[in-house]
Amino acid sequence: MNNYKLTIQYDGARFKGWQRLGNNDNTIQGKIESVISEMVGKETEIIGCSRTDAGVHALNQVANFQSDEKLVEHKVKKYLNQYLPNDISITNVEEVHNRFHARYNSKVKTYLYKIWNEEHTNPFMRKYSMHVNKKLNVKSMKEAAKHLVGSHDFTAFSNAKSKKKSMVREVYSLEVMEEAGFVQIRVSGNGFLHNMVRKIVGALIEVGLGQLAAEAIPQILEAKQRNQINCLAEASGLYLENVEF
């Protein structure tokens, strides 16, 4: 069996997320599987590294699929890009060891979140950022971010769909940056619970607006109560930026 690794970019604005939900659904996984299956002449499943939600984008999503026949990488890339919609792009195709698994072999995932932080709206970024029209206190947000770095039980930063055996995850870095009207948040970790990144961003927004004290973050982590964070950041501002194996 031959195993192929795909690197994928997509604009998630019109899709129902990564994960296939049915035979004819509007998901990124479904669209790619349909084209690959047509190419190889049999139904083929792809495995994605991150099951991004509806409206979430990817700069470097990674997936893999297996094929009985030997495929030529550059021909696979050309075929997929020819028949996929233009808001999904295959940037690289690479044959890998048959034990490679995009989800289970990932070691570090990095997400980027974009907040448009001006009083006026940005019509060109409305599907690609979250608009916060009150000035955020970035200094306070940076202080709050420090409390989230490290290994913690992130139950308070998940939702009811997160039914993992362990809610402990390690955040390697969490940066808050200002640039040309935007506040951007970059977070790297060994894995994330469902909605964890959007809840982290939501908490930092609450801190930036003065609705939550930076010093309250450790107590929120300790309490493990999901209702402590009221703001779930919009999907539109979230990007899967990078995956390391």
Swiss-Prot record:
<keyword id="KW-0819">tRNA processing</keyword>
<comment type="function">
    <text>Formation of pseudouridine at positions 38, 39 and 40 in the anticodon stem and loop of transfer RNAs.</text>
</comment>
<keyword id="KW-0413">Isomerase</keyword>
<comment type="similarity">
    <text>Belongs to the tRNA pseudouridine synthase TruA family.</text>
</comment>
<dbReference type="InterPro" id="IPR001406">
    <property type="entry name" value="PsdUridine_synth_TruA"/>
</dbReference>
<dbReference type="Pfam" id="PF01416">
    <property type="entry name" value="PseudoU_synth_1"/>
</dbReference>
<comment type="subunit">
    <text>Homodimer.</text>
</comment>
<dbReference type="InterPro" id="IPR020095">
    <property type="entry name" value="PsdUridine_synth_TruA_C"/>
</dbReference>
<feature type="binding site">
    <location>
        <position position="111"/>
    </location>
    <ligand>
        <name>substrate</name>
    </ligand>
</feature>
<dbReference type="GO" id="GO:0003723">
    <property type="term" value="F:RNA binding"/>
</dbReference>
<dbReference type="GO" id="GO:0160147">
    <property type="term" value="F:tRNA pseudouridine(38-40) synthase activity"/>
</dbReference>
<dbReference type="InterPro" id="IPR020097">
    <property type="entry name" value="PsdUridine_synth_TruA_a/b_dom"/>
</dbReference>
<protein>
    <recommendedName>
        <fullName>tRNA pseudouridine synthase A 2</fullName>
        <ecNumber>5.4.99.12</ecNumber>
    </recommendedName>
</protein>
<feature type="active site" description="Nucleophile">
    <location>
        <position position="53"/>
    </location>
</feature>
<dbReference type="InterPro" id="IPR020094">
    <property type="entry name" value="TruA/RsuA/RluB/E/F_N"/>
</dbReference>
<dbReference type="InterPro" id="IPR020103">
    <property type="entry name" value="PsdUridine_synth_cat_dom_sf"/>
</dbReference>
<dbReference type="GO" id="GO:0031119">
    <property type="term" value="P:tRNA pseudouridine synthesis"/>
</dbReference>
